[in-house]
UniProtKB/Swiss-Prot annotation:
InterPro entries: LysR-type_TF, LysR_subst-bd, Tscrpt_reg_HTH_LysR, Tscrpt_reg_YidZ, WH-like_DNA-bd_sf, WH_DNA-bd_sf, YidZ_PBP2. CDD domains: PBP2_Nitroaromatics_like (cd08417). Pfam families: HTH_1, LysR_substrate. The gene is yidZ. GO terms for molecular function: DNA binding; DNA-binding transcription factor activity. Belongs to the LysR transcriptional regulatory family. The keyword NADP does not apply. Keywords: DNA-binding, Transcription, Transcription regulation. SUPFAM superfamilies: Periplasmic binding protein-like II, Winged helix' DNA-binding domain. Involved in anaerobic NO protection. PANTHER family: HTH-TYPE TRANSCRIPTIONAL REGULATOR LEUO-RELATED (PTHR30118), HTH-TYPE TRANSCRIPTIONAL REGULATOR YIDZ (PTHR30118:SF11). This is HTH-type transcriptional regulator YidZ.
Length: 319
């Protein structure tokens, strides 16, 4: 028999979502500021109401049952719509409005001063939270923790970061496409040599850890050629790799998108750019579409529509 929602304490659904996110009674309790015992009691009520275990205890934490996995997206949508409903007065007035972004750095930072000024000009009491784009950022968008993502995807046919592989619940718009270039200190010894593949591979490289992976499409292209970089240093992102490449007394190379030229100019980094020594077909596999991403449920959200259009205008010179 179908149960009525009036027989369910809706606070239990918040508990259910946190359990799904944390996979731990203790961690969910900490986020709810209650005891683990209280969360266990809530889980017991949920199991009774849904007539399903919902989670199974394993050495790695709580593992969701098939029913729970099937409900995850609907639960996230319901929580997001509830938050938007409760936040409705703030959408009518600038006071209390929050902007939550997950963005690649330095991509967001090269125009962030202008972006923040426009936000505060339109919404003087708004708050802005920017987190680095990471392996779990798409999940954060799905959960409603992030309004908008801004990051590069990949074009290599074997990449896991293709736009075509995005979840169906995610909408996107490509703002511009860019190619990675090689960045060298102004007095780097490679600049005294003929710039070719042998020179590129002769020197040690700085790589970045991208969504929990130490390699990316560049390494796939090299592998297809039977070649490999000597990765001497791995750093969290392009910002750090460019900073290190500019330091004296080493022969490290960094590889980063050409848009980083603006970041280098802003911070007066003594770097010179050289194109990757590949043919046109190989470079095509390295094209990076820099993309805005949001959840479909926010496609008609006035705040997010305004934010998207503002970012598009600020970055239009790169398209």
């Amino acid at each position: 028999m179908k149960k009525s929602i009036t027989s369910l304490d809706l606070n239990l659904l918040l508990c259910l979502q946190l359990l799904m996110q944390e996979r731990s009674v203790t961690k969910a309790a900490k986020r709810m500021n209650v005891t683990p015992s209280a969360v266990s009691k809530s889980l017991s009520k949920l199991r009774t109401w849904f007539d399903d275990p919902l989670f199974v205890n394993t050495p790695l934490g709580l593992t969701p049952t098939p029913l729970m996995v099937n409900m995850e997206q609907s639960l996230a949508d319901w929580m997001q719509m509830s938050n938007q409903l409760l936040d409705k007065p703030h959408h009518e007035s600038p006071r209390g409005l929050k902007f939550e972004l997950a963005a690649e750095s330095p991509l967001v930072m090269i125009m962030f001063n202008s972006l923040s000024q426009q936000i505060y000009q339109r919404y003087p009491q708004a708050t802005i939270k920017v987190r680095n784009w990471d392996y779990d950022s798409l999940d954060a968008i799905t959960r409603g923790e992030v309004d908008l993502g801004f990051t590069g995807r990949e074009s290599h046919p074997r990449s896991r970061e293709l736009l075509s592989l995005l979840p169906l619940s995610i909408d996107f718009e490509v703002l511009f496409s860019d190619l990675p270039w090689v960045w060298l200190r102004e007095d780097h010894p490679a600049l005294q040599e003929e710039w070719n593949l042998e020179t590129f591979l002769r020197y040690p490289h700085i790589s970045i850890c991208w969504e929990q992976s130490d390699t990316w499409a560049l390494d796939d292209v090299l592998q297809e050629m039977g070649r490999k970089r000597n990765i001497a240093l791995s750093l969290p992102g392009f910002e750090q790799s460019l900073f290190m490449a500019a330091q004296p007394n080493h022969s490290l190379l960094a590889t980063a998108p050409l848009y980083c030229q603006r970041y280098n100019q802003l911070h007066q980094l003594p770097l010179v750019a050289r194109p990757l020594p590949f043919d046109a077909a190989q470079r095509e596999k390295l094209m990076v579409p820099f993309t805005l991403l949001w959840h479909k449920r926010n496609s008609h959200n006035p705040k997010i529509i305004w934010l998207k259009e503002t970012i598009k205008t600020l970055y239009s010179h790169l398209s």
